[in-house]
Amino acid sequence: MADTVPTELIEFARHMAASHGLEPALVCAVIEQESSWNTWAVRYEPGFLARYVAPLYTAGKFSATEAYTRSMSWGLMQVMGQSARETGFAEPSLVELCDPPIGLEYGCRILARHIARAKGDVSAALLAWNGGATLNYAEIVLGRKRNYSSQPVK
């Protein structure tokens, strides 16, 4: 865990996790892996665009700008824009996902959905979260989870 992360941010993430029935240590580990606690982390995923978003754009469902922003991961948990839209995110700009309360709400909502679909198998849920791009992703995140497991939720 980075020593420079504000305690308030860690506590807020732990609170949001608990409010979604998630292990706070797991959400903190995902955040550390995905963004290193950078609230403004943004990454374009060209493979995601081609596979998931381009067919919707081609069908005229939304603009090119929306297509590209849906193909980006945003904020602390690196929530994919398309996943946020599918989960009910209706704000005009996906950059709002960089605001910790909003990004953590949608990130926790999506992660909880993956865990439910995987019938509680956290490793499988983490692979779904990551899109299977990194085969040892679950192992990495679960290793990071140990750094946060001994900290009680305040």
Q: Where on the chain are the PLM-derived regions?
A:
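Catalytic glycan-binding domains that act on GlcNAc-containing polysaccharides
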Residues: 2-154
